[in-house]
Amino acid sequence: MLGLIMTEYKPKRSRNIYSPNQEKPFKLSRSKVESFMKCERCFYLDRRLGINQVPGFPFNINSAVDELLKREFDQYRERAEPHPYMVDAGINAIPYQHEQLNKWRENFVGIQYFHEPSNLLLHGAIDDVWKSEEGELIVVDYKATSKKDKVNINAPWQRSYKRQMEFYQWLLRQNDFQVSNRGYFVYCNGKRNRDAFNEKVEFDVDLLPYDGNDDWVDTTIEKIVTCLNQDEIPNPDERCDQCKYNQEVIQYY
């Protein structure tokens, strides 16, 4: 007998829906800004009409790596010492100690900034922040994968990783921190060239530098507000798989 596969998807909600000219600030996460960048139509259906996007599957192994890296870097944070990864990479910095760090890392809280012209409360949960010898904050993002080739951030789909880092840099700057354009991806690549599993996966760890440019953020916020305030649903995006799927399915209704 086949087991029943249950889904947690709830297509329609009544909360966290944008209303034009609302007085209360509208909370918008970094991931929702990325959703707008990918498809204005799907974003509008979600944030303006309350039709949830279909969620992806959780990457629990990645989450475990993320949590363990945070604990590991926190040990060096407490001692105000650089992690050996940083020393080996020649990075003159230490993990940054700040009373709000745990909030900055917390999902649905994160670093927040109220953008008064748009009435948007923008936020994003970071993985880590380091502080350079010059006193600038360095945004750090943890990534985990398993591939035969050496990791890099050059694939077209990884542009979203770069925007993610740039958005965090922008949030910190809006909170009056001095932030370096250069951030780092702590990229963990699970090794496959072992004879057996033996209850563990070993990783190669690379620190990949990236020089961000957050100039796009303010312009994007303006476009988001314009999108949310319009009454017409944006046209389907030819780059969006969900839109393409919907366009095919609708022919049979």
List where the protein language model places each region.
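Metal-dependent nuclease catalytic cores that hydrolyze phosphodiester bonds in DNA/RNA
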Residues: 2-136
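Short catalytic/ligand-binding loop motif for oxyanion handling, primarily in non-cytosolic enzymes
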Residues: 44-45, 52-54, 147-150, 191-195, ...
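Mg2+/Mn2+-dependent nuclease catalytic core
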Residues: 106-219
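Calmodulin-binding IQ motif helices
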Residues: 39, 168, 243
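Short, polar/flexible loop-turn hinges at active-site or ligand-entry regions and domain interfaces
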Residues: 55-56, 152-156, 231
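Metal-dependent nuclease catalytic regions and adjoining charged, substrate-binding loops involved
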Residues: 6-9, 19-21, 27-28, 171-253
